[in-house]
Amino acid sequence: MTEIPSSFVLPDPEWIYRVGIGQDSHRFLPDEDPKPCILGGIIFENTPGFEANSDGDVVFHAICNAFSSVTHKGILGGLADELLKTKGITDSVVYLQEAVASLKPTQQVSHLAITIEGKRPKLLPQLPSMRKRIAEVLHIPLDSINITATSGEGLTAMGQGYGVQCFCVLTIMEYCRY
């Protein structure tokens, strides 16, 4: 092996960026169903929950899918299904924690952009709480997360009130030395 001379200066470390995209959607259960509506880790009162094996949090699920598109590790449909089957875990917070754990030690979350489409529930009053909860689970600053909400003018099933869908774009910084 060749020895590096002491006068040799290594280049500054480099950061590369990886971008993941995730999507998820779920249909509402009947209004009389007691399952709570959870979005971004926040319970929405007076709105039915979602048809799902888990708690149905489409925001956390879209984020998990965005992580999977960066890390190539299946969280939903893979690890989450296994956690449900073996331990009965339906809490999407646990799935999202597993997604964060799937990052390499050289990777960190830089930014998260989230768009939620649905006629109900009314999201605007809860957006700050949702951002705070996501920041807590991901261990990132609040200003690294933005959430927009739209009804889509009623053009889709989501905008007509049948369910909610979420899209997420995740930016990961990765430390590399060349």
Curated annotation (Swiss-Prot):
Entry-linked Pfam families: YgbB
Residues annotated for 4-CDP-2-C-methyl-D-erythritol 2-phosphate binding in this entry: D24, S25, H26, T150, S151, G152, E153
Any one Gene Ontology BP term: terpenoid biosynthetic process
Cofactor(s) named in the record: a divalent metal cation
Stretch forming the signal peptide: none
Site positions for Transition state stabilizer: N53, S151
Cofactor note: Binds 1 divalent metal cation per subunit.
Keyword Metal-binding tagged: yes
Family: Belongs to the IspF family.
Subunit structure: Homotrimer.
Protein's UniProt name: 2-C-methyl-D-erythritol 2,4-cyclodiphosphate synthase
Organism: Chlamydia trachomatis serovar A (strain ATCC VR-571B / DSM 19440 / HAR-13)
